A protein has these predicted regions:
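Membrane-interface "cap" regions at the ends of multi-pass membrane proteins
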Residues: 1-47, 51-56, 69-73, 85, ...
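Helix-loop-helix connectors at the membrane interface of multi-pass transporters/channels
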Residues: 2, 6-15, 90-93, 99, ...
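Extracellular loop-to-transmembrane helix junctions
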Residues: 21, 44-141, 254-263, 443-452
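TM-loop-TM module centered on a large, flexible mid-protein loop between adjacent transmembrane helices
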Residues: 90-92, 97, 129-133, 203-206, ...
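Membrane-interface loop-to-helix entry segments
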Residues: 124, 138-197, 251-255, 376-389, ...
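C-terminal membrane-solvent junction of multi-pass transporters and transport-like membrane proteins
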Residues: 166-167, 336-347, 387-438, 468
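Hydrophobic alpha-helical segments and their helix-loop junctions in multi-pass secondary transporters
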Residues: 170-203, 267-273, 387-404, 461-465
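A generic transmembrane alpha-helix motif of multi-pass inner-membrane proteins
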Residues: 374, 378-386, 415-486
Length: 486
């Protein structure tokens, strides 16, 4: 394997990049960006949010999409300057120090570890929709799903990229088909179940803002978390060919996808049917296609929703494996997570995440009625913390630029540093609005517990972190020479 196919190692901040293959092409990066920004938040969550808040949901997606885009642009600037599979953890280490890297990494791991728990259980629930699988225990299906995606991740980064490419392609094709059929139904005022499609459904069901302000704020929190995964493109940059060229294209096109797919789809849902016709128990796509009489619509949408869950699971194992390795090499995570297999895959970190995923099956067996609420609240905490740390890291980077210690790449976050502060304020307001509901207050309480555990964890590992940082960089210089000589 040539030197050009491997990630160079020069400093401790680069140590976690040693040994990876740069096998992800432009189409993989583009689809990973799509897979991260379009997922179960649209295919599953949009129905329930529409039923609660009405057409204003489209505006919520638009506003939250802008701030998610700003966060990704901040990450993109850092990634173009120095692509790293450690992504925001590596950048936090460079600009905030080891303490910042520790907090960022464990927030991100918390997010995706509990999301994996939710995803494998979701796959099992979706499979039970069909009669032929109803006799199979839920834990068996969950285990098979986890094993399948685990194997894909262990094979190679190219196998992961190919799987995510096709998962994302199915989601995009489904949305495009829906949008075409929905526009036709609205223009022709075609019957959709007991209703008639058309813009009149907005006025006849209470206008654009039928819900109260507290409800809208509660929905906004859910919408922000629906964009969780957009940061995945930063992790993939470390294993991309020509990252400096293809990463800006992937990130810039993300804002178009957000507005076109999310805002466009939700607006069409509101025109096609009164918002009261939707439900949190059913995908809005299924509601629409069933209403216009498309044969086997529910079966088709069940396959798509299943694909969305597998896509999320696939991305979760990929990202957490690499993040844990970056942390393990400097003493911030378990040593086992630092190991690579012969395919240059961080199998240690992937095994740890997959093992925690099995706890999701146990959780659903013990508290099936509230399991998803528990894990998604924890995931929300991880997303909020990760995004905030990305923006704070970018601010620290800008301070070094101002002092003349480094330079900004051509691909820059627009309006920085003011947009950093604006985005941080927005996320703080949205998270703080949790006090309006009992579930939200419980989430904030969990956030406090996580912060306490992180503080305690840092004091537990900080002595060995400093010693291992320099050792990791030095030892990996030798490893890089061996890998490049394969």
């Amino acid at each position: 394997m040539s030197d050009n196919d491997q990630t160079p190692v020069s400093t401790a901040t680069d140590a976690g990049d040693a040994g990876y293959n740069k096998a992800l092409k432009n189409r993989h990066i583009q689809m990973i960006a799509i897979g991260g920004s379009i997922g179960t938040g649209l295919f599953l969550g949009a129905g329930g949010r529409l039923a609660q808040g009405g057409p204003v949901l489209a505006l919520s997606y638009a506003v939250c999409g802008v701030f998610a885009f700003l966060m990704v642009r901040a990450l993109g600037e850092l990634a173009v300057r120095r692509p790293s599979s450690g992504a925001f953890v590596s950048y936090a280490r460079e600009f905030l120090g080891e303490k910042g890297a520790f907090v960022t990494g464990w927030f991100f791991f918390l997010d995706w570890a509990v999301t994996v728990m939710a995803d494998i259980t979701a796959v099992a629930v979706y499979m039970h929709y069909w009669n032929m699988f109803q006799g199979v225990p839920q834990w068996v299906i969950a285990l098979i799903a986890l094993a399948l995606v685990f194997v894909l991740n262990m094979l190679s980064v190219k196998a992961f990229g190919e799987a995510e490419f096709w998962f994302a392609l199915i989601k995009v094709a489904t949305i495009l088909i829906f949008m075409g059929v929905a526009i036709w139904a609205i223009l022709t005022q075609a019957p959709v179940g007991e209703y008639t499609a058309g813009v009149h459904n907005i006025a006849e069901s209470g206008g654009w803002f039928p819900a109260s302000l507290p409800v809208v704020f509660a929905l906004t929190l859910g919408v922000v978390f629906a964009f969780g995964g957009t940061e995945m493109v930063g992790v993939a940059a470390g294993e991309a060919k020509n990252a400096a060229t293809i990463l800006p294209k992937a990130i810039n096109s993300m804002v178009i996808r957000i507005f076109f797919f999310y805002v466009g789809s939700v607006t069409l849902f509101a025109f096609a049917l009164p918002y009261t016709a939707y439900s949190g128990d059913e995908s809005p796509f299924t509601t629409f296609f069933s209403g216009i009489g498309v044969p086997h619509a529910a079966d088709i949408m069940q396959v798509v929703v299943l694909t969305a869950a597998l896509s999320s699971l696939n991305a979760g194992l990929y990202a957490t494996g690499r993040t844990l390795r970056s942390m393990a090499l400097v003493g911030e995570g378990p040593r086992f997570a630092s190991r690579l297999n012969k395919n240059h895959v961080p199998y240690g970190g992937i095994i740890i995440t997959a093992s925690l995923g099995l706890l999701g099956v146990l959780l659903n067996a013990l508290v099936p009625s509230s399991a998803f609420e528990i894990v998604m609240s924890l995931a929300g905490i991880g997303i909020a913390g990760t995004w905030a740390m990305i923006l704070i890291t970018h601010l620290a980077f800008l301070r070094k630029v101002k002092r003349g210690e480094t330079q900004r790449p051509q691909f820059r976050m627009p309006g920085a540093p003011y947009t950093n502060y604006l985005a941080l304020l927005f996320f703080a307001v949205v998270v703080s609005s949790n006090v309006m509901t009992f579930e939200g207050r419980a989430t904030l309480a969990l956030f406090g517990v996580v912060v306490v555990l992180m503080v305690a964890g840092w004091y537990f590992v900080r002595r060995r972190v400093g010693n291992l940082t320099d050792e990791a960089a030095a030892s990996l210089q030798g490893d890089e020479t061996l890998v490049s000589g394969d």
